[in-house]
From Swiss-Prot:
The gene is frr. This is Ribosome-recycling factor. Responsible for the release of ribosomes from messenger RNA at the termination of protein biosynthesis. May increase the efficiency of translation by recycling ribosomes from one round of translation to another. InterPro entries: Ribosome_recyc_fac, Ribosome_recyc_fac_dom, RRF_sf. NCBIfam families: frr (TIGR00496).
Length: 185
């Protein structure tokens, strides 16, 4: 019974950590990352489709992303979807592909991204605390139903807190690593 609670807490905490790392890919660092376009969808025959499912998205160099659609008529649609996404660059349509030229990041942009990374980290910590609350509630229910003793419940609460502390530390480390990556010129 308790192992199920711990395993569930661990699985959910791991998912929160992975979600944080995925969120971090949307932050721009010193070099371009094609994941900055992951949230962009284009109208493909009446259906909103992720950009990477209708085109090849490549980082040509440290400051350029090239998007080559699999069907030429999509060029204009892709161009307008990127412009509407407001990612800080203007798309350039050369007739074959759409190119995005990212200027070097300013100190202010880097610091703004650090703030966003910290906010993402806080959101992940809130998620971890909510997972802890659910686990503690499950332990409390077992104790109330007399399925476990008071001593077992105390040990279970300690284990839940230990798992929470472990994942909170992992989140802090991830934020710190992302911060140093963002501030590196």
């Amino acid at each position: 019974m308790l192992n199920e609670i711990f395993n569930k807490q661990k699985t959910q905490s791991e998912k929160s950590l992975e979600a944080l790392k995925k969120d971090f890919t949307t932050l721009r660092t010193g070099k371009v990352n094609t994941h900055i376009l992951d949230h962009i969808t284009v109208d493909y025959y009446g259906t909103q489709t992720p950009l990477n499912q209708v085109a090849t998205v490549l980082a040509s160099d440290a400051s350029t992303i090239s998007i080559t659609p699999w069907e030429k008529p999509l060029l204009k649609t892709i161009e307008s979807a990127i412009a509407a996404a407001n990612i800080g660059v203007n798309p350039n349509n050369d007739g074959e592909s759409v190119k995005l030229f990212f200027p070097p990041m300013t100190r202010e942009q880097r610091e703004e991204n650090v703030k966003q990374a910290k906010a993402m980290g806080e959101k992940a910590k809130v998620s971890i605390r909510n997972i802890r609350k659910d686990a503690n509630d499950a332990v409390k229910k077992l104790e109330k139903d007399k399925a476990i003793s008071e001593d077992e419940a105390k040990k279970a609460y300690d284990e839940v807190q230990k798992l929470t502390d472990t994942y909170t530390t992992k989140i802090d480390e991830s934020v710190k690593n992302k911060e140093s990556e963002l501030l590196k010129v």
